[in-house]
From Swiss-Prot:
Source species: Phoneutria reidyi
Keywords, in A-Z order: Disulfide bond, Knottin, Neurotoxin, Secreted, Toxin
Top-rank lineage group of the source organism: Eukaryota
Name the UniProt record assigns to this protein: U7-ctenitoxin-Pr1a
Subcellular localization, as worded in the UniProt entry: Secreted
Comment text on domains: The presence of a 'disulfide through disulfide knot' structurally defines this protein as a knottin.
Disulfide-linked positions: 2-16, 9-22, 13-48, 15-40, 18-55, 24-38
Free-text function comment from the UniProt entry: Probable neurotoxin.
GO molecular function list: toxin activity
A GO CC term attached to the entry: extracellular region
Tissues with expression: Expressed by the venom gland.
The keyword NADP appears for this protein: no
Family per record: Belongs to the neurotoxin 09 (Tx3-6) family.
Amino acid sequence: GCKARGDTCQKDCDCCGCFYKCHCPLDWFGGKWHPLGCSCVYGDKYICEKKKKECPNV
């Protein structure tokens, strides 16, 4: 299943829905190391287009 808003995630595709993205407050190294962790947050119409291309479950 997918992760709801506020849940810990590793990538955008982990998050439920087209408009939710995986946000990392301190994403220093391009997504490889997350000192504070990442969580699903509400994005925008652009994340929806990106997820439609990249995620099999959208």
